[in-house]
Amino acid sequence: MARLITSLETLLYKASTGHLDSAPEAQFSSEMAVTVVLASEGYPSTQAPVREVSGIEKAEKVNGVEVCYASNVGRVLSVVAVGKTFKKARKRAYKAIARIKLDGSHYRGDIAAKVAE
């Protein structure tokens, strides 16, 4: 979704009203996108107590980054980063997620590692 240039609202409206044939063709940016998920303590086997998440605003100050917040437990949020290369997008995603604080949380450190080499 981070790479979608065409209006998602228009595409969904056309699809829901049976007029997808007259919808504009979906256009995507040539940039690469990387998403890293921040999970709460114990995920996926147990549910952690609700804790405060901080640093989202700081994370979103990283160029090309958007934070998609979901909840305070389980898969808490996703950090989506775009860049001209996978290496750049990956670097931005991990720079941003390092700014987010949630006691006991964790995230994978190998997302897009192979394609970013």
Which residues does each predicted region cover?
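Generic C-terminus detector
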Residues: N72-E117
